[in-house]
Each structure stands twice: as C-alpha cells, then as structure tokens.
C-alpha cells in the first residue's frame, strides 16, 4: 500500500460545496475551533457579519465547507474574496482563511478546499490565487508547496490592527 492510498480512501468521502444559509450552525462550530487554533477570540458580531456576507450575492466574499459524507460532519472551510490589483488586468483571489479540523488533517481535505477555490477563481475569470500562512505551520506548508509556490514576500500589518 502506497503512502497516498490512505489519503485517497478518505478523500473519496470528502465533498466541498459553497456555503449556503442552512450551513450557519456547522460553519459557526468550525469558526470557533479556528479561533482556538489561531489563539484568538473575536466578538460574536464578526461571525454573524461574516456569514451574512457569504450568502449576500452583492458581496465578493465567499465560503466553502468540506463535509465527510459518511458522518455528515463539516470538517473544514475556506474563505476567499477577489479584488483589483495593480499587478494584473483581471482581479485576483485572496484565500483569507483555510481550516481543517484536527481529526481530518493530512487526509486530503485541505487539498480539496484549495482545489475548490481554484475552480471558483477560474469560473470568476480570476485564476491568480494567493494566501498567507503562519511561518511555523509546517504541516500545512507541506501541502501548499504541492499546490502552489512560496514567494519571498514578507507580510506587514499596521500597528495596532
């Protein structure tokens, strides 16, 4: 049995779909887990506003959920948006968040979520997709280097925000 076969077996149980209004409870559960993973706590109105934006067709912020088809559980999400840039004529897609539950990691869920975002970016006519990750998140970077390339850029943020 090759190293890829266990991932493939589990991968067949994963379905990724765009977030719908009925997914709010499942998404909220993952959103709280994600905050714990990121060692942060956000006010409840951030979750409420973010989810409302996902389902508002006038807002260019989308979410996708990964589900285990055997259990029906939501096991991961990706959030993405497109925006103008001075580097391309067409807009680009920024994957704002990517999260997979601890029990579902290294089973192909992250890859399926990224592939979903890539597919949606292609549909939008904005195939350039980028994201950032924590420098110490080596497990995720093992996947990222298979589906994208690492740049030499360093991210800076305004003080206090």
Swiss-Prot record:
Cellular component, GO annotation: cytoplasm; nucleus
Enzyme type, top EC level: transferase
Name under which the protein is recorded: D-amino-acid N-acetyltransferase HPA3
Substrates-to-products reaction catalysed: a D-alpha-amino acid + acetyl-CoA = an N-acetyl-D-amino acid + CoA + H(+)
E.C. no: 2.3.1.36
Family membership: Belongs to the acetyltransferase family. GNAT subfamily.
Mod. after translation: Autoacetylates in an intermolecular reaction.
Superkingdom field: Eukaryota
One Pfam family per UniProt: Acetyltransf_1
UniProt: acetyl-CoA binding residues: 98-111
Claim: Transferase is one of the keywords in the record: yes
InterPro entries assigned to the protein according to its UniProt record, in alphabetical order: Acyl_CoA_acyltransferase, Diverse_Substrate_AcTransf, GNAT_dom
Disrupted-gene phenotype: Sensitive to D-methionine; abolishes the formation of N-acetyl-D-methionine and leads to the accumulation of D-methionine in cells when supplemented in the growth medium.
GO biological process: one example: cellular detoxification of nitrogen compound
Residues where N-acetylserine is found: 2
PROSITE patterns in the cross-refs: GNAT (PS51186)
Gene3D superfamilies cross-referenced by the UniProt entry: 3.40.630.30
Record keywords: Acetylation, Acyltransferase, Cytoplasm, Nucleus, Transferase
Site (Important for catalytic activity): 144
